[in-house]
Curated annotation (Swiss-Prot):
InterPro entries: Dual-sp_phosphatase_cat-dom, Prot-tyrosine_phosphatase-like, Tyr_Pase_cat, Tyr_Pase_dom, TYR_PHOSPHATASE_DUAL_dom. It catalyses: O-phospho-L-tyrosyl-[protein] + H2O = L-tyrosyl-[protein] + phosphate; O-phospho-L-seryl-[protein] + H2O = L-seryl-[protein] + phosphate; O-phospho-L-threonyl-[protein] + H2O = L-threonyl-[protein] + phosphate. One of its GO terms (biological process) is regulation of cell population proliferation. This is Dual specificity protein phosphatase 22. One of its GO terms (cellular component) is plasma membrane. Disruption phenotype: Enhances T-cell mediated immune response. Increases susceptibility to experimental autoimmune encephalomyelitis. Aged animals develop autoimmunity and inflammatory phenotypes, including raised inflammatory cytokines, anti-nuclear and anti-DNA antibodies, renal damage and splenomegaly. It comes from Mus musculus (Mouse). The gene is Dusp22. Monomer. Interacts with LCK; the interaction is direct. Interacts with UBR2; the interaction is direct.
Amino acid sequence: MGSGMSQILPGLYIGNFKDARDAEQLSRNKVTHILSVHDTARPMLEGVKYLCIPAADTPSQNLTRHFKESIKFIHECRLQGESCLVHCLAGVSRSVTLVIAYIMTVTDFGWEDALHTVRAGRSCANPNLGFQRQLQEFEKHEVHQYRQWLREEYGENPLRDAEEAKNILAAPGILKYWAFLRRL
């Protein structure tokens, strides 16, 4: 959790509160946009575009209502060829949940494959049970409309995210490793 931000897809990173204030690391990864999702989320650095979502890391916190604005923020950043850091305090639950919703929207992945994609880049990724339930509901009832909205709003995705994510999951041993961990 303290080893720096993790690249999930090209131009998309997950990190913690400390990473979001590390100007050198942000510059090195060409981060121009930061999505902060924690109790005291607010802009902290000059020259960075922010989306701040005040949210607690509790199972009762509704993150679903922030999916659309988060997806729009991340996608517009990446379409401009820039990089976005999504962070909460530890970079484990809230930020991971928003990135999973984004991956589900830009690919045909369900929430579990999207989680495995995130974990391939950030092994500590672990949305709380309430957020997992919200992602399951998003998969069942809303993700298809979000995919359609994204296509209508931005056209076909030139970022090749589905291909990138499938390559991540196809890496030797990734799914076997996560299946093993699930049994523990």
